[in-house]
């Protein structure tokens, strides 16, 4: 038989989080080399534990997950999600506006597949979380990347966004809090972004999965609360805030111009029906998890692990000549900048590979986040503070005489 080749729809799809550097690190680990994995946001692998509220809800209700559930998700779970978002200021939403999925990843792909036609364009941030760019490609559309400005706390560049809107632009993606930068967008900025969407009749996708991991007593503002006249699709879930990445527990909420989006919503129902239902077991913990904000808050205040891990990382980064960064306000990521002239860096993947081979620490190069210059990389700040501090000291030692060989 002829060779079977992958679809052209996958031509531009990439996942550097589990890309070449990950593959090489996996090979090294199989050979018995201890590799510190700062590549993926998977808290449980670094000693974080799910809250007792989640564990007890799972154990006490497991039998309820045996049959298929509603194709949009269990009613009790959708009711608790609806109440959570109403508490954040959402107006005129009901449990029928909530769709539960096998993680936000599944829902992003479903929503973009439902919305986009071949040739459509959608505005996606650069840097971004690659799921968004990849899902646009899989839907047959074109991601158009707008710049988030490092000199302005990694906030979206409004002029750049305006310059990239065309008659083919259907929607804009906002990742707030942001992955990979850890930026948190203030209300005033969100109002301006919403106004751009309003003036250009754009759907807004607002990825807010890190909204419960905001530090320094800052406020997270949900985009939907500022756009009651627009269709806003808000993505959220429990993977990070409640340490259950493997459960694949995410949801999306449709708000605003729902009347105009009836056919779109019907399309989402079609795709939900195709997979019968999302995994029922993790849905059982949603009400208990959302009723237990303190278990998350304990991690993000002074003395909490996420807070102290950030502080340890930044203290050591401050000591490295040739690296600058913007301190994250949320989540557990930071996206430092390298002085590429100082280190002769032309290939960020090669830099990450060299660091891996030298110090046995795995990071993800900026290219994995739709960043076109070879001058950034993402650090996942999940190991304990002393481990992160050593990794950053190792980075400084590595860079002290680094000169990339071309």
Regions found by a protein language model. Give the residues of each.
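N-terminal small-domain helix-loop-helix segment of the aminotransferase-like
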Residues: 2-103, 110, 289-292, 401-406
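Generic structural signal for small/hydrophobic residues in well-ordered secondary structure
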Residues: 21, 38, 58, 81, ...
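Helix C-cap/helix->beta junction micro-motif
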Residues: 31, 139, 199-200, 230, ...
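Conserved core segment of the aminotransferase class I/II
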Residues: 55, 228-304, 314-316, 399
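PLP-dependent enzyme catalytic core of the Aspartate aminotransferase-like
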Residues: 87, 162-163, 344-346, 354-363, ...
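Conserved PLP-anchoring active-site segment centered on the Schiff-base-forming lysine
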Residues: 114-136
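Active-site phosphate-binding strand-loop segment of PLP-dependent enzymes
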Residues: 144, 149-220
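Conserved glycine-rich beta-strand-loop-beta hairpin in the small C-terminal domain of fold type I
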Residues: 287, 303-314, 325-339, 373
